[in-house]
Amino acid sequence: MADETTNGAAAPADQQQQPVMPTLKIMAQFIRDMSFENIAAQKGVQGEGQPDIQVQVNLDAKKRTVEKQFEVAIKLNINAKTKESGDMIFGLELDYAGIFFIDNVPDEQMHPFLLIECPRMIFPFVRRIVSDVTRDGGFPPLNLDQIDFVALYRQEIARRAAAQQAAPSAEV
């Protein structure tokens, strides 16, 4: 009889002492938009050796109409050019989104949470899509390096702060 449950009188005190852990669930993920152009095949561009590959990454996050749900998107723009002449070999644009249920994250931490943790969770799928599309397009698979989303977030915050300081103040 010593294993019987209590009537719950001690439960509220225990809950106050325990920190509430954030909840993050991926509800869905999908390709919102994608474009791949094999320019080398269209124009007959010949390139020997490793191409010069440029990858641009943009992140976007917005609240959905459903409570505690957010949509986070990774937008990639990848261009491969020959090192010798700079001729375009291929171009890939990918807009990949995830729908997330997020709970127990303080408001002041939500912005970095959305632009760091959520992209980190869906990035492996983005990497695979890029690899598959470049391979299916007739090139060796392009395996993207891991993206440091913390550094990307900090760069964006610094860029916004610099832009805000550079903007002339409106005096009336």
Curated annotation (Swiss-Prot):
Q: One Pfam match, by short name? A: SecB
Q: Where in the cell is it found?
A: Cytoplasm
Subunit = Homotetramer, a dimer of dimers. One homotetramer interacts with 1 SecA dimer.
Q: Which GO terms describe its cellular component?
A: cytoplasm
Q: Mainly localized where?
A: cytoplasm
Task: Enumerate the InterPro entries for this protein.
Answer: SecB, SecB-like_sf
Q: Report keywords, A-Z.
A: Chaperone, Cytoplasm, Protein transport, Translocation, Transport
Transmembrane stretches in the record are none
Domain of life the protein comes from: Bacteria
A single Gene Ontology MF term assigned here is: unfolded protein binding
* GO biological processes: protein folding; protein tetramerization; protein transport
According to its UniProt entry, the function of this protein is described as:
One of the proteins required for the normal export of preproteins out of the cell cytoplasm. It is a molecular chaperone that binds to a subset of precursor proteins, maintaining them in a translocation-competent state. It also specifically binds to its receptor SecA.
The entry's family comment says: Belongs to the SecB family.
Q: What is this protein called?
A: Protein-export protein SecB
Q: Does the keyword Protein transport apply?
A: yes
This protein's record includes keyword Nucleotide-binding: no
